Design a protein with these regions (language model features):
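A general, composition-driven signal for non-globular sequence regions
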Residues: 6-8, 45, 89, 172
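Short amphipathic alpha-helical surface micro-motifs
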Residues: 5-10, 31, 96-99, 159-162, ...
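Intrinsically disordered, low-complexity regions
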Residues: 4, 15, 38, 61, ...
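Sec-dependent signal peptide cleavage junction
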Residues: 2-22
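Substrate-binding cleft of extracellular glycoside hydrolase catalytic domains
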Residues: 17-147
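Glycine-rich, histidine-containing beta strand-loop boundary motifs that form or position
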Residues: 11, 81, 155
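Surface-exposed substrate-engagement region within the catalytic domains
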Residues: 105-114, 121-202
Length: 202
């Protein structure tokens, strides 16, 4: 799948492709990984989900290079933001706005997927209740949508089932889930497509 950026009058880069074929292979990367994604493209990756931001102050220093490398290697670029808003809808909106500004600054084409990475860590509390948590996540996703990006929600299958009112997410944003769930631990050399999708909304 090829992304061919085009420029419009506002100088905003627009994604020409905004969908991924079924069973396509891809990677997610952060500052821990290389800025050069060519090896992944040669191995068959058709998309790259790049960490753009975290909270309201961290921006991936390799993000621009990783997004640029994805595009140069015909990989569909996407982004994700590590959430720290717990179940606070007001803070979720602020984090979404920071994620949007980071995505734009790093060169993520408008129209691309931009995910909310919701998990424990960095003070993010996931045990405040399913409904209030879902409302905060939806507040984040609504901001992403309004800015011209496509919202996704990344979380483990356990968190999606036990800590979030996930049906309310999927009702508003169908097929918006990016699920972390593994049939086994350790190294897996070939994808097990019989295992995924693991739940509705993937």
């Amino acid at each position: 799948m090829t992304i061919i950026p085009s420029f419009i009058s506002t100088s905003q880069v627009q994604a020409s492709t905004t969908s991924v074929a079924a069973k396509a292979l891809g990677i997610d990367v952060a500052s821990y990984q290389s800025a050069d994604l060519s090896a992944h493209a040669k191995a068959g990756s058709q998309f790259a989900i790049v960490k753009v931001s975290e909270g309201t102050s961290y921006r991936n220093p390799k993000g621009a290079s990783q997004i640029k490398s994805a595009i140069a290697n015909d990989m569909m670029p996407m982004g994700y933001h590590f959430a720290t808003f717990s179940s606070n809808a007001s803070l979720a909106k602020k984090e979404a706005q920071y994620a949007i500004s980071s995505a734009k600054a790093l060169g993520l084409p408008k129209g691309s997927y931009l995910a909310c990475d919701y998990e424990t860590g960095q003070g993010n509390i996931i045990t405040n209740g399913k409904s209030v948590t879902a409302k905060a996540i939806l507040a984040f996703m609504d901001e992403i949508k309004a800015a011209g990006y496509q919202p996704l929600l990344y979380a483990s299958s356990s968190v999606l089932q036990n800590n979030i009112n996930t049906p309310s997410i999927v009702k508003k944003y169908p097929n918006s889930l990016w699920v972390a769930a593994y049939a086994i631990s350790g190294r897996v050399d070939k994808p097990n497509f019989k295992y995924f999708p693991s739940m509705d909304g993937v």
